[in-house]
Amino acid sequence: MIVYGSTGNSYISRSEICKSKELVDEYEVFIPAAGSGSDTFPHQILGKPFVGLKGSACSETYVVAGPFASEAACKNVISYIQTRLFRFLVMLRKPTQHALKKVYAFVPMQDFSKPWTDAELYAKYGLSDEEVAFIESMIKPMDLTGGED
């Protein structure tokens, strides 16, 4: 089976999986556990998330979100992670480049039967124009196509 790690992908047998064996055959989103350490703004905050293949695992290089019922739900989760509001809320709890589970404490759960946009989230939570402008001045758009941040 494939294992996603910091130096690329590797392969191991299922018997070598030590933790969270029950997640191996589920739909999951992998989020890099370390983001850019840059102090410049606007900032990316998190590395690019991706949907892991069923039957895969990851090293501690990633934080796992899930399991989810379908690949479509995973893609909707990624649309949420991609929003500036999501990453702004993470930034409030992320004093270093490490993005471990605790940095997601301020991020509210959503209905992942649909994709999310910042405009929808700003309206849902009643953010003012000033609040939106502040968030957008602090958080860089996340482009999920190719390359690094």
Model regions and ranges:
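Polybasic, glycine- and aromatic-enriched phosphate-binding surface used to engage nucleic acids
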Residues: 1-115, 120-126, 131-149
